[in-house]
């Protein structure tokens, strides 16, 4: 859901974090927190999921450069099998490539088709995009004197 339709690589968010390195997530977060004003909305999002990230790092599950991350490749009878981490249990199981929401299939038709859907997946994507765009608008004065300089 959080991939190409919203302008991210086709890997999606979690596979992208595996590629970059999960061990970098807390370092980037700490760096941002130390440099941002206290009223910056970024401070509100730090924390959720932190326990999962830290336990993954402690286990050596730092992504592709480690034993795995949110995903890992395993071998079964000589064939590569993609596994996904269950965020509740921490166990890996065969990745289910079937879309969980009808809106996920609509994403192939573009963002507006995805957002026109009425399911939890589309609502999640809409919430993420609205929060992201609101944050981008909030930081415009720190980046530029006007929005036109950014957009042009």
Where are these regions (language model features)?
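N-terminal glycine-rich phosphate-binding loop for ADP-containing cofactors
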Residues: 1-152
